[in-house]
Amino acid sequence: MVLQKNKAMTVDLESIDWAVFKTAYGTATFVPKLIVQLAGNNHEIAMGASHELWCALCHQHAYVSSAALPSLPFILKVLDGANDALSVEILDILLGFAVCETDGTENAPWLEQLRAEVTRAHRRFRALSSSQNETVAYFAVAILEKIGEKNLEMLQLL
């Protein structure tokens, strides 16, 4: 089942032209490999991939890169099945998506869309905010605070 899930994810990842997106390190052509590793069965490799994604997509919470937008749905899918340790790392990435601005070198119409997509995932964060794992709960609450109740109210009107 996991193999089929990862194969479907790989097909979906390959349908995106990652070369048009940027990371902190340049073009995002390496991001799909990291997402596949994040979703894989090897916990150590997944944890390493989470760190690399954190550095590349929301560069140490200093700024967010355009590759965050196409990465988001895949990262959210992985979060749904992640253990607590991996969930903490993924939530840290997602917090970066919620709080970081761009590095200022590019026009960033995608940033508003990224924030809207993070806001649409609020039910996941609400569920995780009551996790028995205090760190998971902390990050989920932090994301909810950053996306704000005003944004959630606007979503309910849509």
Where are these regions (language model features)?
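N-terminal "cap/leader" segments of large eukaryotic alpha-helical scaffolds
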Residues: 1-46
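HEAT-repeat alpha-solenoid elements in large eukaryotic scaffold proteins
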Residues: 5-13, 43-56, 91-104
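Flexible loop/turn segments at the boundaries of HEAT repeats in alpha-solenoid HEAT proteins
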Residues: 20-24, 60-68, 99-115, 151-155
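Core helices of alpha-solenoid repeat scaffolds
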Residues: 27-32, 67-72, 114-122
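Buried hydrophobic core positions in alpha-solenoid tandem helical repeats
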Residues: 33-35, 74-76, 124-126, 158
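Short inter-helical turns and helix N-cap capping residues of alpha-solenoid HEAT/ARM repeat scaffolds
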Residues: 41-42, 80-84, 132-133
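Positions within ordered alpha-helical repeat solenoids
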Residues: 55-59, 77, 81, 93-103, ...
